Amino acid sequence: MSQLTPMMRQYLEIKAGYPDAILFFRLGDFYEMFLDDAVKASRILDITLTSRNKNSDGADVPLCGIPYHSATPYIAKLIEAGEKVAICEQVEDPKSVKGIVRREVVKVITPGLVVDSSNLSPKENNYLLSLYCDDATTWGLSYLDLSTGEFRVTELDGFDAAVAEVACVKPREIILPAVFRENGRMKELMPVTAGLATTFVDDWVYDLDYCKRLIGSHFGGASPSALGCDGLNTGLYAICAVLHYLQETQKGRAGHVNSIIPYTNREYLVLDESTRRNLELTATLAEGKRKGSLLGLMDRTTTAMGGRKMKQWINYPLVTIQSITERQDAIEEFVQDPSRRTALVFLLNGVYDLERLNGRISLASAGAKDLVAMKESLARIPGIKELLASSSSVLLRRLNEGLNPLPDLVGLIAGGIVENPPFVLRDGGIIADGYNAELDELRAISREGKGFIARLEAQEKGRTGINSLKIRYNKVFGYYIEVTKTNLTSIPADYIRKQTLANAERYITPELKEYEDKVLGAEDRIRELEFSLFQEIRETVTGHGEIVARTADCLATLDVLASLAELAHERNYCRPLVDDGTTLFISEGRHPVIEAMHQGERFVPNDTLLDNGENQLIIITGPNMAGKSTFMRQVALITLMAQMGSFVPATEAHISLVDRIFTRVGASDNLARGQSTFMVEMMESANILRHATPKSLVILDEIGRGTSTFDGVSIAWAVAEFLHDNDKHAAKTLFATHYHELTELAVTRKRIKNFNIAVKEWNEQIIFLRKIVSGGASHSYGIQVARLAGLPLEVIERAKEILQNLEKGEFAEEGIPRIARGKKSAGSAPASQLSLFDSGEDMLRKRLKGMDVTTLTPLEALNLLDELKRMV
């Protein structure tokens, strides 16, 4: 190392502290990367890889670099690739230092710690999540959005609950204890950590005393109890890992992270990963797009922070009637007063993302434009408060109280920062005239000096008679007089030559040099003073961060309420009655998303009645494409919307609180976990049967179709019986099936009812009426659906022939079903499993044909007679 240059020694010393990050090493106007970092970064960023002086072993040192003033898109590309970036700045002025300039890493940017708005999706959070579990079954989970300051923590009972919550949060980066790599936990977590940036924290961090000290240090001496985290155990360790990581990466700058929000699953309607996916709450199943999801429909918010809160409300519906009613009252007030709603939306339209502005200001990464955006946002609040002043809604009054316009802060920014400041702080032109006397004086000197230069140029042109004479400036020579070579004979004696060019000479004079020193000195001082004054203003704004955060949260909530009111008004939704009973009644319910996406068609509404009495389990039969899945999903979505506090797509609705919504809708192979379609289906079903309660809502679509017919109907039958007979798990259930045999359950189970999707037959065609009617379906209409799907006519005709054989119970003499032989086949086909719909008479005939009555003992004959009796 002694053979290395001082700069490379400094680089390697700093790099040693950040081995897992790409080090952006500031050299003048560039960030340089060396060695392995350079090789990796050049490949990801598609920039030139070069080399510089050889290192101690004689090899070239790989090198690449980017301009510091345009680093943002390059950093974003590295973060998107899952890399971490350590920003190493010069912390001394090179002009005032002899030798190597001192450098330090000022922050580390990771996928979970992005704060630059240009690298973030406005209506999506960017979470860093920490997960911890000791030898017990309780998992601690905390997550932070550094860009907004939102910090939450919970404890979850069991691995499945922890995995479900990680899937709901959708973090960009996850923090895990280093010991997880050794004790097998990492392998368990692979399905949820795949594709995530993962950081392992040293095990010593998970020490209770250290955790309490770290929490107290970050939150101004507050204890976990004072922060509302009393009673947490594993959750404290999850918090500690996040704070430790912040300390390591942000160098103490995270003052806007000033509170923790503890929560439990009991506070919200529980939705597992499968349910969120199947109901397409925030993304579509097919493409993973926002458009076409419930969020895509409901989000009419004006602000980015309102959009993020809307998603949070959808992911975490409420289970407290008071909170739901408060939201309903606020929405109803806006529905009934459209002019006030319109005025509110207009004012919100001028509000920037206060949460993320507040975050950048706290992290000292905000520019002057950010301060102006905050000023303009806060300036809208008096008008909003005036609109809310007459509200009768408890929630709207509370939100109004939480809004603080901070007039002194608005005045400070308005008086200190120009209306349209430049992006680059060091360029100057940020501070308004009249804000600082010294700055005003320096600007006057600068303006006067520039005026002098213009007058001097005119004077010299007159004195020399050289009309082409120019006074110019560059960073190397400062101000100079440029004269073309054709005019050199007219040069005065007091001109001092500075530089010879091909077609001109450059000169200075003592008078020009004197004014140069005065003007340039003033401009340097102006830039320094402006930056210092800007930092003072930004620091003052930082001190109001907690108030700004509360105000931003109130504005986001208002935005969501106005959005839900707009949706209710536009789509003619009703206010549901929500209580703590056992009834789920919906009159003329519609699927919110499908109705909105097919506005040219009339959506057929349907009624629903579920309870814990005579209508606990509804079996729904009918052909594919008739609308069974749509109906069941709409019931689940209406229930969820009601518990969000939203109005719902129906003419009337009475929704008793549910604790969980389960869905078993469709399936696909999970090759990553080595699970087949049927295995996925059975695992989801098992989860439902373990956790469903009488207060749950269960949606089951085609249980058992991933295996043989007899296996499938047996499983479906047993699942239905379990949900009916087991009082502990007797959830309100919608059960769609193609197994018509399941309709027999209504005969023996008093709380099971049969319904089907009405279909009209006409000229061998079917028309789906989309209406749910009482009773089981008489036909499956599979062949008609196949015709609609475009199967070849030959296949359709053969299917009809086979169906007739099945319905008549026709078999060949050797017991092989006639469906095994087509018209063109020859020879005997191997025996196959009989259809579920084989006639009982044929089964009886086969049994009789296969027995030898001459060899039966009396006891065997009696047993056989009993068996035959049961068969008929």
From Swiss-Prot:
Coiled coil: none annotated. Gene3D superfamilies: 1.10.1420.10, DNA repair protein MutS, domain I, MutS, connector domain, P-loop containing nucleotide triphosphate hydrolases. The keyword Cytoplasm does not apply. GO terms for biological process: mismatch repair. Keywords: ATP-binding, DNA damage, DNA repair, DNA-binding, Nucleotide-binding. GO terms for molecular function: ATP binding; ATP-dependent DNA damage sensor activity; damaged DNA binding; mismatched DNA binding. It holds the Pfam family MutS_I. InterPro entries: DNA_mismatch_repair_MutS, DNA_mismatch_repair_MutS-lik_N, DNA_mismatch_repair_MutS/MSH, DNA_mismatch_repair_MutS_C, DNA_mismatch_repair_MutS_clamp, DNA_mismatch_repair_MutS_core, DNA_mismatch_repair_MutS_N, DNA_mismatch_repair_MutS_sf. The keyword Glycosyltransferase does not apply. ATP binds at G622, P623, N624, M625, A626, G627, K628, S629. GO terms for cellular component: cytosol. NCBIfam families: mutS1 (TIGR01070), PRK05399.1 (NF003810). Belongs to the DNA mismatch repair MutS family. This protein is involved in the repair of mismatches in DNA. It is possible that it carries out the mismatch recognition step. This protein has a weak ATPase activity. This is DNA mismatch repair protein MutS.
